[in-house]
Design a protein with these regions (language model features):
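Bacterial N-terminal signal peptides
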Residues: 7-15
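Bacterial N-terminal signal peptides that target proteins for export
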Residues: 1-7
Length: 237
């Protein structure tokens, strides 16, 4: 009887582990897909999107799809997304991120708000490589300019490390994210890469992008006609 019970418990635990692994992989793939859609919208709506000059000067792009749902403020929950940075060989493989806390300045009633953060200089890049940082605490940030001619000003070129944007119903707007914490999503990293990898390893271009991330990498390249992407490799099983 005891042996039977132990076998049942073991089988149940194994089944739950397999279900969690499958769900985690599907969630990570879906996040890549939604992030790609946000990037496509940047290219398709130049008059209402992020200025080309701003994008071309960005060292890293972070996309957090569907930050707000169901008419509630983001609050204490964690949004999750994807980051990639420029390297000598092109855009790096994608790193999985999470974000939470802080004062978002979002209005109740908005649905499907996507967040885009552009890291604009080396100091901001180093903060991102640290695996965890606080916006406006560790890294300076400001709402980014919007529209084809919005980049004419020079404020964003001076000392801002990160420019932040929200997107709702296809329209981009600058947003403040004071106090928000950005950190690595270790679970999704293990799920897609099959091992522990730091932000620094991924975003410095030291690993190739898995094949399951190719759609996202193509979407990133489409935002920058001069960009290239690393050769993809099979996912880790």
């Amino acid at each position: 009887m005891k042996i039977t019970s132990l076998l049942l418990i073991g089988a149940f635990t194994l089944a739950n582990g397999n279900i969690w692994a499958t769900t985690g992989h599907q969630d990570s793939i879906e996040r890549l897909r939604m992030s790609s859609e946000v990037l496509h919208s940047i290219v398709e709506t130049p008059d209402k999107g992020i200025p080309e000059e701003v994008l071309s000067n960005a060292k890293c792009i972070i996309v957090i799809p569907h930050l707000v749902k169901g008419g509630f403020i983001f609050g204490g929950e964690h949004g999750r997304g994807i980051a990639t940075c420029r390297t000598a060989e092109g855009w790096s493989a994608p790193a999985f991120v999470s974000i939470g806390g802080g004062s978002w300045g979002l209005q109740i009633g908005l649905e499907g708000i996507d967040l885009v953060m552009l890291v604009m200089n080396d100091q901001g890049f180093q903060h991102l490589l640290s695996n965890k940082f606080e916006i406006s605490g560790d890294a300076s940030a400001s709402a980014g300019p919007v529209g084809r001619h919005a980049s004419a000003g020079t404020d964003w070129k001076l000392n801002t490390e990160i420019l932040t944007y929200s997107r709702s119903r296809g329209v981009f707007a600058g947003i403040t994210l004071d106090g928000a914490i950005v950190e690595q999503d270790n679970d999704s990293t293990r799920t897609i890469y099959g091992r522990e990898l730091t932000f620094r390893t991924i975003l410095s271009g030291k690993v190739a992008a898995p094949k399951s991330t190719l759609g996202f990498m193509k979407a990133i390249a489409a935002t920058d006609h001069t960009a290239t992407i690393a050769e993809a490799k099979p996912d880790k099983e």
